[in-house]
Amino acid sequence: MNAITNFLRKKNSSCALIPFITAGYPNIDICIKALKVLDREGADLIELGIPYSDALADGPIIQEASQAALKQGIYIEQVLSILTKVIPDLHAPIIIFTYYNPVLVRGVDKFICEISQAGAKGLIIPDLPLEEVDYILELCNLYSIELILFVAPTSSQSRIQLIASKSPGCIYLVSSCGVTGLRDNFDVKIQHLANNIKSTTNKLIMLGFGINNPDQISQIINWNIDGIVVGSAIITHIVGELPQDMLNSLAHFCKKLKYSIHTASNVK
């Protein structure tokens, strides 16, 4: 039932690399090939984002990718088709990243059932109201999907404890206020927040928003983080006119991130 948490726990002290890409971007064929490249080059888990027109938590790079995918007609139906085609060829479990409105429009029960049948193992809904969590959790448990809840830098201690009490096993810690995108460094209070979660709960932590280079990874590894999410920086490597050049660039970048995690983990 908690496939993502169980997977991360099996890695013991090793931090997981979790790349994010937008489903259907820049087109379905390259998206499928990109997922296979990420899997081959060391991704431990992969986040696949469902394109959405009002993606408030996403920065300009991911928003542009979503808009481009939507213009090509990439909606939930097409995302399910991508999952069905590619998951049998992947080792890395897939986590679906979507906003709540598309889930409601599709029908919550239907949506969670469909992503489960397509082979996804996890679900992230960044704008999910805390009041709705119990209902979503019930359906996720029914269909063996792990729901991963968000903790923001502005979350109070009482809210963190409430989120942790509802979380099946893994918390997504947002590295900064605002939207996703490329950043140079992280506020030390994020480290304190991560330490707080680790010391007061038994939950694992995925850290995301703004991670894009080896120096940041070296910093984050020392925070006892269980998984590092890289999104905008990944998407910048699948922009261009020559598909093979894009995939080669993506492979090189993913390999570099994986090496950085491995190296930083060994010197902790």
From Swiss-Prot:
Its main location: plastid. GO terms for molecular function: tryptophan synthase activity. It is found in: Plastid, Chloroplast. SUPFAM superfamilies: Ribulose-phoshate binding barrel. Disulfide bonds: none annotated. Its EC number is 4.2.1.20. The active site is at 47 (proton acceptor), 58 (proton acceptor). Signal peptide: none annotated. It comes from the Eukaryota. It is an enzyme of class 4 (lyase). Keywords: Amino-acid biosynthesis, Aromatic amino acid biosynthesis, Chloroplast, Lyase, Plastid, Tryptophan biosynthesis. Belongs to the TrpA family. This is Tryptophan synthase alpha chain. It comes from Gracilaria tenuistipitata var. liui (Red alga).
